[in-house]
Amino acid sequence: MEKFLVIAGPCAIESEELLLKVGEEIKRLSEKFKEVEFVFKSSFDKANRSSIHSFRGHGLEYGVKALRKVKEEFGLKITTDIHESWQAEPVAEVADIIQIPAFLCRQTDLLLAAAKTGRAVNVKKGQFLAPWDTKNVVEKLKFGGAKEIYLTERGTTFGYNNLVVDFRSLPIMKQWAKVIYDATHSVQLPGGLGDKSGGMREFIFPLIRAAVAVGCDGVFMETHPEPEKALSDASTQLPLSQLEGIIEAILEIREVASKYYETIPVK
């Protein structure tokens, strides 16, 4: 069985100090869980915040520098997201995986720019997109030269200010790419607090259990030492102190469920 992928880190690059604190813990976990491939994630620009008054970040230059510090200090792989095509090249200098935001998952120029860098590309499936439509996204990336492609399930719009996860999407999307389950954004209530998104953190672990049982290739979890003080996604980030326990549970569930991943499909 391949290593299980865990993408984790604070939602936004609030400070270099925060990144190093979280990076130190993820490095420790990487030494404990040898069957897991860890990738450190944080965003230099939260470009689609609900309100103009919300914290966006410190910009590309600061972000790349801070992420490089984490990479050099702890030897962790790095991922971050881009929002415009011109950002692909400078981000590729530090990122091992380039992330495409859900709202931008169909933007052809952005996908091609990410693919052109030669880095792995992880596309968040839009909240508006059917799982079978991600095949077109993958074809665009392959056309651009991408060799390592991930698709991330992060919930589907379910009326106003709500998301629901349809776990059928995991085996559907696995037909053309490796599939990641986004455990923290999937429990968001988009715009649910008026000028910012809310969320239901208590459902992070129940839905992770389901995703691993169905058979995802990895999980994405935004994590923060003090989520209630986070400058973005305060309602859904996982407390850093709980990350280790969740990974232990993931591996136990995967060990049992993996025996049945390749069963004969019922038709």
Curated annotation (Swiss-Prot):
Its UniProt entry gives the catalysed reaction(s) as: D-arabinose 5-phosphate + phosphoenolpyruvate + H2O = 3-deoxy-alpha-D-manno-2-octulosonate-8-phosphate + phosphate
Q: Which domain of life is it from?
A: Bacteria
- EC number annotated for this UniProt entry: 2.5.1.55
Q: Which UniProt keywords apply?
A: Cytoplasm, Lipopolysaccharide biosynthesis, Transferase
Q: What class of enzyme is it?
A: transferase
**Gene3D superfamilies per record:** Aldolase class I
- Its primary localisation, in coarse terms, equals cytoplasm
**Biological process GO annotation list?**
keto-3-deoxy-D-manno-octulosonic acid biosynthetic process; monosaccharide biosynthetic process
Cite the HAMAP family for this sequence.
Answer: KDO8P_synth
Q: How does it assemble?
A: Oligomer.
What is the name listed in the Swiss-Prot or TrEMBL entry for this protein?
Answer: 2-dehydro-3-deoxyphosphooctonate aldolase
Which organism is this entry from? Aquifex aeolicus (strain VF5)
Q: Which gene encodes it?
A: kdsA
